[in-house]
Curated annotation (Swiss-Prot):
Residues 331-537 form the PCI domain. It comes from Bos taurus (Bovine). Component of the eukaryotic translation initiation factor 3 (eIF-3) complex, which is required for several steps in the initiation of protein synthesis. The eIF-3 complex associates with the 40S ribosome and facilitates the recruitment of eIF-1, eIF-1A, eIF-2:GTP:methionyl-tRNAi and eIF-5 to form the 43S pre-initiation complex (43S PIC). The eIF-3 complex stimulates mRNA recruitment to the 43S PIC and scanning of the mRNA for AUG recognition. Belongs to the eIF-3 subunit L family. GO terms for molecular function: translation initiation factor activity. This is Eukaryotic translation initiation factor 3 subunit L. Pfam families: Paf67 (PF10255). Its main location: cytoplasm.
Length: 564
């Protein structure tokens, strides 16, 4: 394959007279560096710059050395060593820093050199080229103007097949280790590209007959069954569920890991695949199954596996959303509040890496919107700092939702929900223009129906708080309802305020029926008796925190005043 003519500029720009440099591109002379970059942007012939060649050769050597060391250790029946750990650390630095910097400088909106072009530089190393293509296609999806072509979508799928076949179909453990961040990104991107293709194939209006025929004749490419098969195979190969079961009970997971699960590559891919299955089932609208795949992961306990922040944030986002759609509002609020507090306290750590910050910041905003919805439908106390953030962001919208404005509910849901998809290949002979929106519209209808059922509850709650006893007929009159309609709404109130709530145990599906409503009532003949069940707010903790903040501010001001 060759670049389209207008993409030659992506590789352009090698000045044969400039300082060749090593893979980090610095000469030490700012003027020379700037001139080099300008020449790089202006020239348009197909030559791989020396700086990129050096980087790719260094990248290949690091991966190749790691594989050689891993082969040696597998032959010696050793799981890992300090040498392997050091090589993984070097690859992590290349992956998170060097690759990102080079991309930003030379391939910001254009593709990297194709694998076929760089193959001679790396001795046609098949494993390295698979890893390189994983990064190459991911960059096209994320940054290249116009996104991937149909051909590139297919090629990326085949490359993932090659990668997973290498890992899963070897006679023994594959001689490879990769940083946890990269392993998570592989699973995350694999599902994202499946999601992207599922939506792409439904939009046929601007596609040529040739493209539609190509899609029609290849129904198994990015098929939901193949994606599920990969994720389940990685889970089974790693024996991760059994490892987690033993780990949460206080045992040694290594004792049940098996031949493959002892190795970090398989263990972490297995764990990340569980989160991938959570995400995939959520995108398909199967919320019970989404949470069930995590039955051996204890969300409320810090795990040895939660080393990748994006994985942790993604897990909580999809678990919280699944709880919301299952009408387990109290659990959804707890999950969202916990992860938002975690993000709030560790935000500075993410800001060091732009691409991580963008992803986490987006899900942070979405979870604030989902929390606003959940708290409107099921009012309860949350952490003070999260509550303040929520009031700043969505105070007005929450007031409108409390008044029963369905438009605000729909707006926040549309903004914060996942991009739902249909697992079914469309009928290409009869695809209407909005076919790709049908999965979303179906989930929106389910959500809107639930909102509609609760439309009167906020008003009823506010009236109930005003009285301790009241004739049913009189209170019905205040609400412009007949006595029968009001009794139905009271029954709805009782039903909707009773939630299945997780209390203990590992499985997130476990729980007991509870009510955290601030008011409760019972009806005796024609009288309604109301009790305020609100727990008194502990103001002491709030004032202590404010005093500590004031003292810290006072100390800072004194230090500033002492400066000459």
């Amino acid at each position: 394959m060759s670049y389209p003519a207008d993409d030659y500029e992506s590789e352009a720009a090698y000045d044969p007279y400039a300082y060749p440099g090593d893979y980090d591109m610095h000469t030490g002379d700012p003027k020379q560096d700037l001139a080099y970059e300008r020449q790089y942007e202006q020239q348009t012939y197909q030559v791989i710059p020396e700086v990129i060649k050096n980087f790719i050769q260094y990248f290949h050597k690091t991966v190749s050395d790691l594989i050689d060391q891993k082969v040696y250790e597998l032959q010696a029946s050793r799981v890992s060593s300090d040498v392997i750990d050091q090589k993984v650390y070097e690859i992590q630095d290349i992956y998170e820093n060097s690759w990102t910097k080079l991309t930003e400088r030379f391939f910001k909106n254009t593709p990297w050199p194709e694998a076929e072009t760089i193959a001679p530089q790396v001795g046609n190393d098949a494993v390295f080229l698979i890893l390189y293509k994983e990064l190459y296609y991911r960059h096209i999806y994320a940054k290249v103007s116009g996104g991937p072509s149909l051909e590139q979508r297919f090629e990326s799928y085949y490359n993932y097949c090659n990668l997973f076949n290498y890992i899963l179909n070897a006679d023994g453990p594959a001689p490879l280790e990769l940083p946890n961040q990269w392993l998570w990104d592989i699973i995350d991107e694999f599902i994202y590209q499946f999601q992207s293709f599922s939506q792409y194939r439904c939009k046929t209006a601007k596609k040529s007959e040739e493209e539609i025929d190509f899609l029609r004749s290849n129904p198994k490419i990015w098929n939901v069954h193949s994606v599920l098969n990969v994720l389940h195979s990685l889970v089974d190969k790693s024996n991760i569920n059994r490892q987690l079961e033993v780990y949460t009970s206080g045992g040694d997971p290594e004792s049940v890991a098996g031949e493959y699960g002892r190795h970090s590559l398989y263990k972490m891919l297995g764990y990340f695949s569980l989160v991938g299955l959570l995400r995939l089932h959520s995108l398909l609208g199967d919320y019970y199954q989404a949470i069930k795949v995590l039955e051996n992961i204890e969300l409320n306990k810090k795990s040895m596996y939660s080393r990748v922040p994006e994985c942790q944030v993604t897990t909580y986002y999809y678990v919280g959303f699944a709880y919301l759609m299952m009408r387990r509002y109290q659990d959804a609020i707890r999950v969202f509040a916990n992860i938002l507090l975690y993000i709030q306290r560790t935000k500075s750590m993410f800001q060091r890496t732009t691409y991580k910050y963008e992803m986490i910041n987006k899900q942070n905003e979405q979870m604030h919107a989902l929390l606003a919805i959940a708290l409107t439908m099921y009012p309860m106390r949350i952490d003070e700092s999260i509550h303040l953030q929520l009031r700043e962001k969505y105070g007005d919208k929450m007031l409108r939702m409390q008044k029963g404005d369905p438009q605000v509910y729909e707006e926040l849901f549309s903004y914060s929900c996942p991009k739902f998809l249909s697992p079914v290949v469309p009928n290409y002979d009869n695809v209407h223009p909005n076919y790709h929106k049908e999965p979303f519209l179906q989930q929106l209808k389910v959500f809107s129906d639930e909102v509609q059922q609760q439309a009167q509850l906020s008003t009823i709650r506010s009236f109930l708080k005003l009285y301790t006893t009241m004739p049913v007929a009189k209170l019905a009159g205040f609400l412009d309802l007949t006595e029968q309609e009001f009794r139905i709404q009271l029954l709805v109130f009782k039903h909707k305020m009773k939630n299945l709530v997780w209390t203990s145990g590992i499985s997130a599906l476990d729980g007991e029926f509870q009510s955290a409503s601030e008011v409760d009532f019972y009806i005796d003949k024609d009288m309604i008796h109301i009790a305020d069940t609100k727990v008194a707010r502990r103001y002491g903790d709030f004032f202590i925190r404010q005093i500590h903040k004031f003292e810290e501010l006072n100390r800072t001001l004194k230090k500033m005043g002492q400066r000459p």
